Every structure is written in structure tokens, then in C-alpha cells.
Curated annotation (Swiss-Prot):
Gene from which the chain derives: KBTB1
One example of a Gene Ontology biological process annotation: symbiont-mediated perturbation of host ubiquitin-like protein modification
Key word Cytoplasm present: no
Purpose of the protein: Probable substrate-specific adapter of CUL3-containing E3 ubiquitin-protein ligases which mediate the ubiquitination and subsequent proteasomal degradation of host target proteins.
Keyword vocabulary terms for this entry: Host cytoplasm, Host-virus interaction, Kelch repeat, Modulation of host E3 ubiquitin ligases by virus, Modulation of host ubiquitin pathway by virus, Repeat, Ubl conjugation pathway
Protein name per its UniProtKB record: Kelch repeat and BTB domain-containing protein 1
Lineage of producing organism: Viruses, Varidnaviria, Bamfordvirae, Nucleocytoviricota, Pokkesviricetes
Length: 564
């Protein structure tokens, strides 16, 4: 025991024996002896009370009957060196009393106890408490715990004590931990039923309506606490005019496809939002220079090189729902590499590339519909090319730049529709090997090579194309020039990552700030070392709802998927 601890122990002994005590704390019929000087040193409340003539200097009593006796007694013991004995039952009372008496160290100790012991069983209780007493630190932490555990909490006895204002805040949050937006109406209905409160338009506006299945929308229509409110039915009748919604963070998985340095195996990585790290979920033997397309949560990899020196016609796939590889897919019509991959609602497309027979460029575009036994010829580009950007926008296939005859880049931009090819505004510079994505109704490209003659200059350019005005816009450049990077979009933000920079594989990622028009190195999406990212795709979680007929207990059926 150090000297200060010994001193406070002696003073506490004086208090217990009544020596030198000059104040009595009165709470109803209970009295607590203390010393004004000691209380003033620990409590801002007592310091002001005793030093600013709020009470007569000769007054021997302070009445605090509006406070909890046990909490005040525990805190005065704490001031005199006796540790707080905190439990889930008493910590709220002690914290609110410490806050009233302005005992800073006790407040911190109580807050730390709550934060350490916060869980799904007590988060609603602590959230309601923190909201009442305006404790932002606990309110924020308990709110985040509610978001994380929301599907457990819909059957919690305290769920009904959340206010409509709190439910609006919960249902509006991007971090609401649901893997499919259909669970959001389930959460809403559970709260309405537990409170027997009629629905409001403000609550319905919190749902991402454009992402809901028809069955769940019908469940909303038919529920008595919704259908009985005219304004709610009017709102639901006009959902076709609402803007498209962005998925919540937990309703998508960010999946990357690339080559790791472990003998250059194909690596499938999933981004862990909690840990802010990429985790490999599967891998298979070597392949490179292949095309990638995603349809119905299945990642298709077409052509490229495998372990032989020859190009491949094989197509393999990875099912992100079952975490399994698929090998029984019809082969391409001929071996090719450095081709482009796309998908619409029905077909997978393999575009251009280099043929195996004589390493010549090809202009052919083939397509395949899953469940069909073979690939079909679909169209031909105006000229053979490889390593071009490809994008699907408004039902049209766009082919951007690429390498043409003579190993030079091209600046051509063309689109393919049922009426054939159409030329558009050329790129500001000849480019190839760039990443491409459709975001917010525009085509974005980044990185790659750019040169008017020999293909050898690594680019950090970022461009966007507006198909309505047929014009290119140059955006802020990347911090790191990259060949074959991955460009992706989640939650209305653009990211670029991976690729090769100065012949070195880079594991860095960058995030685009649209308002400031700048790219920032992103510490949260750092890739594994020596990893070439071919593509990064947000995968939406799906449940077999589209195959299920609507019934009156459809929401109960949906509830059976919680935890799966």
C-alpha cells in the first residue's frame, strides 16, 4: 500500500468513527457521515455546493433524498478508497448517481464496466438507459450491439420498449446486420406486434423497398397493423416510383478473385467487415489470364492458361452460396486467353482475346446460358482485340480500348445491341488492361497501359463515360499506377485494388471521394501480399424466397432462416 492509499485509509477510519466529520448526507431516514474537504476533492457537485454559499457554512446536513441511498453510499465509500462492486443490476443506478454528483473517475469506471459487459441480453436495456440520461458513449456502443444482434432481439422481452424514434434509427442504418433486406420488414412487423402500435409511413420509408421480394411486400400489404393505415397503403401503392436502394453492408459479401503467390493458385477471398481483412475461402490449381463473369452468385472463370503452356478452353466456376467449385460446364468453342467476361440476367459472355492455334487476336463473342449444353456464337467485334475493357450498361455490351494488331492500344469505344455495333466518343488516350465497372449509371475505367505506340506505359488514369451525353470525363488519378487492377463499387463508393505496379504485385487499395475528386489509400481493404486481383464483386445474399408461394404466415417462414 502506497502512502496516498494509507492516508485515505486513515481518513476513512476517521469517518467510520465520526472523527472530524463536518457533514451529514441525509437520504430519507438514512444518514452518511463525511468530510466536506474529502467530498469536495472528489465531486464537482459537492465542491460547488460547499464553496459557493449554497448552504450555510454552519449547516451540518445535506438532503439528497431524491437519490438512491445505496448508490450514494457506495460512491462515498468509493471516494474514501473502497472499490466499487459493480453488477449488471446496480451499475446504472451508480452511474446516474455519479453523473449527478459529478464524480469523474466513478463515471469512467461504470462506463467501462458497461462497455466490457455489453451483449445481446442487455443492450436494449442499456440503450434505453443511455438515451434517457444522454450518455452518448454507452448509447453508441449499445446501439451498435443492437444492430449486430437485431435478429436475436426481435423475440426479446425488452424489444417492445424501443420507441418509434429508435426503430426508425435502427431500420435506417446501413450496418443493420441482415443478410437480406426481406428481414427488415420482419423486424418492423415484430416490433409492431410487440407494441400493438400501428405502422407509420416514416417506418416504411426506412425499408429498402426496391430490394424486397414480392412475397414480403405482399406480407406488408396484408398485415393488419399496416393495412389499417391509409397513408401506409398509399405509400406501398407508389413504391414503383421510388429510387433504387443501396444494399446494407451485411447483405452483401465482397468476393475477390485473383492469383496468390502460393504457386499462383486461383484464390477466392472474402472481405471480413469485422476484422477489416481479406480471408481466403477457397483456392484451386494454377490459372492466369482468364476472364471472369458473375451470374446468380456464381463466379465463372473462362479460358486463360493452366499448368500447360497452352491456352485453355475450360470454364470453371465457384458457387458463393454453397462454397463449392463447379467443373461440369461446357468448354468454350476454342481455347483463348486475355478475353473479356460479362453477364446479363441470363447469359455469360466471353469476348475477344487471343486464340491458342497461332496466338492471333480474335473478334468473336460467344455466349452461354447456364443449363445449356454448349456455347453459342453471338457476334463479332469490328476488329480483333484482347485485354480490352468490357461493360454491360442499359442492356448493351460496351467494348473499351484494348490491344489490337501490332501490339498497340486503341482508343475505340463501341456498343453492341440487337441492331449491331455503334461507335461512340473515343477514349481521351489509347488504353488496354484497365479495370472496368458500371457505377451510378456510368462506366468507369482505371489503370492499365496507355500509349499511342508500344504497350509499355503503366497508367494511373481514371475516366468515366456518360452514355447519355456520349462523353468521357477525366477524374483524379490513382495514387499508384496499376496494370489489371480490380475496380468495384459498394455502398455508393468506388474502390480500386490489386494489380501490378512497376512489375511488382501490389496489395494496396484506394477509395474514391466523389465530392473532393481524389483517391485515398485504403487501409481497410489491404489485400494479401503478392496477390493479383482479377475481379472484385459484391455478392448479394439470397434465400430461396422466389421459389416459395406466398402464404399468410410467410413472415414466419422467413423467420425460420434466421441463423442460416
Amino acid at each position: 500500500m502506497n502512502s496516498s492509499s494509507k492516508l485515505i485509509a486513515v481518513i476513512n477510519g476517521f469517518r467510520n468513527s465520526g472523527r472530524f466529520c463536518d457533514i451529514n448526507i441525509v437520504i430519507n431516514d438514512e444518514r452518511i457521515n463525511a468530510h466536506k474537504l474529502i467530498l469536495s476533492g472528489a465531486s464537482e457537485y459537492f465542491s460547488i455546493l460547499f464553496s459557493n454559499n449554497f448552504i450555510d457554512s454552519n449547516e451540518y446536513e445535506v438532503n439528497l433524498s431524491h437519490l438512491d441511498y445505496q448508490s450514494v453510499n457506495d460512491l462515498i465509500d468509493y471516494i474514501y478508497g473502497i472499490p466499487l462492486s459493480l453488477t449488471n443490476d446496480n451499475v446504472k443506478y451508480i452511474l446516474s448517481t455519479a453523473d449527478f454528483l459529478q464524480i469523474g473517475s466513478a463515471i469512467t469506471e461504470c462506463e467501462n464496466y458497461i462497455l466490457k459487459n455489453l451483449c445481446s441480453k442487455n443492450c436494449i436495456d442499456f440503450y434505453i438507459y443511455a438515451d434517457k440520461y444522454n450518455n452518448k458513449k454507452i448509447e453508441s456502443a449499445s446501439f451498435n450491439t443492437i444492430l449486430q444482434n437485431i435478429l436475436r432481439l426481435i423475440n426479446d422481452e425488452n424489444f417492445k420498449y424501443l420507441t418509434e424514434e429508435s426503430m426508425i434509427k435502427i431500420l435506417s442504418d446501413d450496418m443493420l446486420n441482415i443478410k437480406n433486406e426481406d428481414f427488415a420488414p420482419l423486424i418492423l412487423i415484430k416490433w409492431l406486434e410487440s407494441t400493438q402500435q400501428p405502422c407509420t409511413v416514416e417506418l416504411l420509408k426506412c425499408l429498402r423497398i426496391s430490394l424486397l421480394s414480392p412475397q414480403v411486400i405482399k406480407s406488408l400489404y396484408s398485415h393488419r397493423l399496416v393495412s389499417s393505415i391509409y397513408e401506409c397503403i398509399t405509400f406501398l401503392n407508389n413504391i414503383a416510383f421510388l429510387d433504387e436502394s443501396f444494399p446494407r453492408y451485411h447483405s452483401i459479401e465482397l468476393i475477390s478473385i485473383g492469383i496468390s503467390n502460393s504457386r499462383d493458385k486461383i484464390s477466392i477471398n472474402c472481405y471480413n467487415h469485422k476484422k477489416n481483412t481479406w480471408e481466403m475461402i477457397s483456392s484451386r490449381r494454377y490459372r492466369c489470364s482468364f476472364a471472369v463473369a458473375v451470374l446468380d452468385n456464381i463466379i465463372y472463370m473462362m479460358g486463360g492458361y493452366d499448368q500447360s503452356p497452352y491456352r485453355s478452353s475450360k470454364v470453371i466456376a465457384y458457387n458463393t452460396c454453397t462454397n463449392s467449385w463447379i467443373y461440369d460446364i461446357p468448354e468454350l468453342k476454342y481455347p483463348r486467353s486475355n478475353c473479356g467476361g460479362l453477364a446479363d440476367d441470363e447469359y455469360i459472355y466471353c469476348i475477344g482475346g487471343i486464340r491458342d492455334q497461332d496466338s492471333s487476336l480474335t473478334s468473336s463473342i460467344d455466349k452461354w446460358k447456364p443449363s445449356k449444353p454448349y456455347w453459342q456464337k453471338y457476334a463479332k467485334m469490328r476488329e480483333p482485340k484482347c485485354d480490352m475493357g468490357v461493360a454491360m450498361l442499359n442492356g448493351l455490351i460496351y467494348v473499351i480500348g484494348g490491344i489490337v494488331k501490332g501490339d498497340t492500344c486503341t482508343d475505340a469505344l463501341e456498343s453492341l445491341s440487337e441492331d449491331g455495333w455503334m461507335k461512340h466518343q473515343r477514349l481521351p488516350i489509347k488504353m488496354s488492361n484497365m479495370s472496368t465497372i458500371v457505377h451510378d449509371g456510368k462506366i468507369y475505367i482505371s489503370g492499365g497501359y496507355n500509349n499511342s505506340s508500344v504497350v509499355n506505359v503503366i497508367s494511373n488514369l481514371v475516366l468515366s463515360y456518360n452514355s447519355i451525353y456520349d462523353e468521357w470525363t477525366k477524374l483524379s488519378s490513382l495514387n499508384i499506377p496499376r496494370i489489371n487492377p480490380a475496380l468495384w463499387s459498394t455502398h455508393n463508393k468506388l474502390y480500386v485494388g490489386g494489380g501490378i505496379s512497376d512489375d511488382v504485385r501490389t496489395n494496396t487499395s484506394e477509395t474514391y471521394d466523389k465530392e473532393k475528386d481524389c483517391w485515398t489509400l485504403d487501409n481497410g481493404h489491404v489485400l494479401p501480399r503478392n496477390y493479383i486481383m482479377y475481379k472484385c464483386e459484391p455478392i448479394k445474399h439470397k434465400y430461396p424466397l422466389e421459389k416459395t408461394q406466398y402464404t399468410n404466415d410467410f413472415l414466419k417462414y422467413l423467420e425460420s432462416f434466421i441463423g442460416s
